């Protein structure tokens, strides 16, 4: 999940500042539990809440990284996989994946009930019979400055707040976990959501480059190329359009009698064809072609021809979310455009809030606080920081790609992912995308994954799956079941 200023248990008002170093010791609190799986089997497991010590370039303690691991004792001769999970932001803890997806406990958020204004009671944490624990051990990691992860260096978190810095920290943390738990021979998977996919692309290459094999990378709601978002470029307009079309279809604005995937397929063709050609011509486009594109765009997105004419074919996500349902006095969500809400100013140009985020944050945060204390018995040293949204202004967005001659001002980590796959041909990639996600539109992911520059023999290692859901694919029952099935099959598959 991208960092949200509303999602906070003990929100940080500003990035973590320099502080006196704490004792450089790793903590571990271990508890035993039993999960009843969907098949009725009893699965004993261990939950470990603890910290991993990260060292700086001088070998001194630099940060303490918090994690929660769920492990099952292997059978004789078994090498159980281990999967490392993290959310994104940058500046988000792993609370969302941890509490709402594949762990042995889950907050069953009801998207439909929570999405209606005033609808839905707060769900309670419960055992998760569909947990992936029967398939893989799981480790949920919090980035430095989030969760209970803290900087120990006198410079505070500045050493960790950047693309390359963050990737180096997670690489070190994963290696440290593998070392202290003797998981060298275990199949290893990375599971990142949102900016976590950015992290996974970089970390996969760094781990492989350091001699640690990575068997698979799972990308949920990807953002791999920040350079596409630079002002003046048309690529993101093209990338958003199929998601606009899916949203308009869901809310009954277009596509009567047409299925979602058929409507989205038409939007893909239009976006990559006539729409891309029109944007490339800029002000040189002819009047007849312009009107033809406007008419097609209106039929796909549900926006009026007059509005598209005034917008000159360029519609930002916040403008779209406000305009689509303006006649109903409603605004759609951004993380999940199926959600709707109301705002005080219906005449505003852009959406000022995100109903999708507002609907889910409270339930997950409240349950997590109780779970840590009562079930895991973890006594923290301070507050759990769910999100640190103010990391954005101080984040170092530059990136040195593998073999690159210079630092790029804006990261394109598709380069890293492609390099990792070429370097380690056994590594597979599973991409998971939601049609109703305007935070990381699926068409942008398609573009990036089509530019990994893989030899034909490796193309089969790249698998893409799509769902009628938003950014956080695990937040409604039907999609959660589909995603769980696909991830379980991916991890369980035998290497070829």
What are these regions (language model features)?
Residues 438-461:
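Active-site-adjacent alpha-helix of alpha/beta-hydrolase-fold enzymes
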Residues 183-194:
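Alpha/beta-hydrolase fold nucleophile elbow
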Residues 192-205:
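Glycine-rich nucleophile elbow surrounding the catalytic serine of serine-hydrolase chemistry
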Residues 468-479:
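Catalytic histidine-centered segment of alpha/beta-hydrolase-like enzymes
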Residues 104-108, 206-302:
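A catalytic-pocket lid/entrance helix-loop region that shapes and gates access to the active site
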Residues 133, 143, 160-178:
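Alpha/beta-hydrolase active-site loop
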Residues 284-439:
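Alpha/beta-hydrolase fold catalytic core
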Residues 12-17, 59-159:
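N-terminal cap/lid subdomain of alpha/beta-hydrolase-fold enzymes
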């Amino acid at each position: 999940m991208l960092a949200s200023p509303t999602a906070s248990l003990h929100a940080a008002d500003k990035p973590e500042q320099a502080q006196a170093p704490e004792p450089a010791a790793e903590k571990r609190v271990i508890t035993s539990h039993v999960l009843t799986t969907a098949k009725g089997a009893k699965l004993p497991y261990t939950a470990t809440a603890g910290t991993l010590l990260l060292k700086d370039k001088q070998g001194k303690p630099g940060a303490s990284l918090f994690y929660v691991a769920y492990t099952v004792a292997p059978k004789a001769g078994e090498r159980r996989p281990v999967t490392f999970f993290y959310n994104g932001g940058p500046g988000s803890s792993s609370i969302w994946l941890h509490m709402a997806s594949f762990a042995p406990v889950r907050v069953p958020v009801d998207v439909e009930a929570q999405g209606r204004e005033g609808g839905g009671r707060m769900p309670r944490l419960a055992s998760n019979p569909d947990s992936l624990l029967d398939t893989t051990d799981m480790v949920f990691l919090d980035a430095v400055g989030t969760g209970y992860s803290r900087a120990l260096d006198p410079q505070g978190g500045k050493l960790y707040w950047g693309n390359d810095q963050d990737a180096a920290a997670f690489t070190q943390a994963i290696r440290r976990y593998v070392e202290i738990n003797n998981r060298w021979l275990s199949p290893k998977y990375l599971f990142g959501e949102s900016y976590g996919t950015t992290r996974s692309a970089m970390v996969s290459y760094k781990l492989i480059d350091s001699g640690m094999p990575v068997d698979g990378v799972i990308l949920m709601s990807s953002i791999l190329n920040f350079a596409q978002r630079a002002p003046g470029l048309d690529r993101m307009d093209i990338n958003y359009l199929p998601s606009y079309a899916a949203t308009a279809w869901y809310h009954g604005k277009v596509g009567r009698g047409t299925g979602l995937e058929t409507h989205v397929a038409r939007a893909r063709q239009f976006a990559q064809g006539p729409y891309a050609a029109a944007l490339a011509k800029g002000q040189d486009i002819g009047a007849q072609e312009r009107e033809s594109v406007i008419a097609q765009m209106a039929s796909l997105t549900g926006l009026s021809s007059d509005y598209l004419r005034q917008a000159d074919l360029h519609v930002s996500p916040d403008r779209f979310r406000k305009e689509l349902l303006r006649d109903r006095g409603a605004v759609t969500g951004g993380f999940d455009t199926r959600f709707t809400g109301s705002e005080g100013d219906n005449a505003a140009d852009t959406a000022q809030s995100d109903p999708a985020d507002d609907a889910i944050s409270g339930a997950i945060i409240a349950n997590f606080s109780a779970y840590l204390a009562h079930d895991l018995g973890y006594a923290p040293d301070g507050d759990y920081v769910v999100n640190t949204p103010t990391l954005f202004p101080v984040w170092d967005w530059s990136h040195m790609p593998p073999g690159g001659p210079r630092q790029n001002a804006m990261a394109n980590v598709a380069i890293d992912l492609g390099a990792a796959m070429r370097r380690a041909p056994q590594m597979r990639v599973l991409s998971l995308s939601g049609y109703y996600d305007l935070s990381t539109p699926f068409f942008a992911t398609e573009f990036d994954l089509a530019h990994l520059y893989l030899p034909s023999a490796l193309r089969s290692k790249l698998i893409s799956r799509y769902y009628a859901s938003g950014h956080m694919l695990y937040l409604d029952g039907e999609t959660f079941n589909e995603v769980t099935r696909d991830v379980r099959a991916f991890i369980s598959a035998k290497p070829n």
